């Protein structure tokens, strides 16, 4: 909530990009084995939240900023985008199950609803109020 969803997505994407570039051995000058590197990214949707987040206070240093392409319904046209969407959803669902096992989050039944707005989840928010992990800017009830 503090940053807004677009900025938070941009920071997360830049963190992932910086980690990937470091793992690949790309140096701070954007070189790999003495040769310049180009990086591309495809975002599923109409908004490039990566480029606008570059060089902001919260953004990590990225040796090679990505050349970003946006594609609405990109998962229909690109296998890599579709695979990334599946990995992201499975990872998020696993995280929600782990969080749901913690006593302070049990009333929200995240182990079952994965944080989506099921009737039980909405009822728990109405009864117990939002948790410290809920986005207050989102319409919760």
Each language-model region and where it sits:
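RNase H-like, Mg2+-dependent phosphodiesterase core
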Residues: 1-141
């Amino acid at each position: 909530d503090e940053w807004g969803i677009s900025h938070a997505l941009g920071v997360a994407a830049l963190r992932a990009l910086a980690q990937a570039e470091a793992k690949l051995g790309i140096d701070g000058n954007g070189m790999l084995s003495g040769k310049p590197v180009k990086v591309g990214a495809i975002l599923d949707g109409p908004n490039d939240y990566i480029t606008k987040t570059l060089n902001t206070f919260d953004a990590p240093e990225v040796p090679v900023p990505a050349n970003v392409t946006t594609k609405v319904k990109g998962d229909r046209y690109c296998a890599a985008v579709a695979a990334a969407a599946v990995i992201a959803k499975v990872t998020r669902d696993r995280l929600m199950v782990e969080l749901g096992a913690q006593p302070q989050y049990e009333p929200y039944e995240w182990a079952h609803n994965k944080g989506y707005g099921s009737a039980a989840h909405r009822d728990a928010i109405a009864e117990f109020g939002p948790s410290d992990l809920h986005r207050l800017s989102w319409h919760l009830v």
